[in-house]
Amino acid sequence: CARPHAAPAEVGADPASLAQAAGRLHAQQPERFALAVAALRQRVPGLAAVEAETGRDGRCTLRFRDAHDEEAFDVQQLAEGTRRLFAWLLLLHEVPPHSLLALETPECRLHPDLLPELADLLRAASLQGTQVLIATHAPALLNALTLDEILCLRRDASGVSVTCAGASEDLRALYEAGEAPGRLWAQGLFEAL
């Protein structure tokens, strides 16, 4: 599971990728692995523990313990949304400061109530110097951001343009009047950027 510390590899929510990422963080930075597990336990009611073990073949096995059942269960038995959340938490705890963290549709399969928390976690990573780039189609995730945190990328024949949603006086006026960014986006008002 261990490899020399470098920029984090791609982390997926599939069981093998998740076990590999967890094992890498557990072996290289056990204190950060513990923080990722604590963050997962905080967001998944009833989750008592997560254990990572490296076998003789070098592969990691993840075992989860429910607070209401003494029997540990395997990562394959974990709900897909919980696996995705754990993948994001592992990545956020592994990525070194001043890195680029690119996430495509991080909202997929996550409980909608977790989207504001995900936004807060990504914001915290950004404040620590990590550049965070998200591609999303989730108004609920956009609602957890400020207009100044939202960049709109447009591609046309001449290239790619980047515009901050907060630079639009019209959007800012609506936002300051109480409209949520996700609702503005869903209404097509970002198209003018």
Feature-to-residue mapping (PLM):
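C-terminal lobe/lid and adjacent interdomain/linker elements of RecA-like ASCE P-loop ATPase modules
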Residues: P116-L193
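Phosphate-coordinating catalytic segments in nucleotide- and nucleic-acid-processing enzymes
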Residues: C1-P96, R183-L184, G188-F190
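Walker B catalytic acidic pair
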Residues: E104-T105
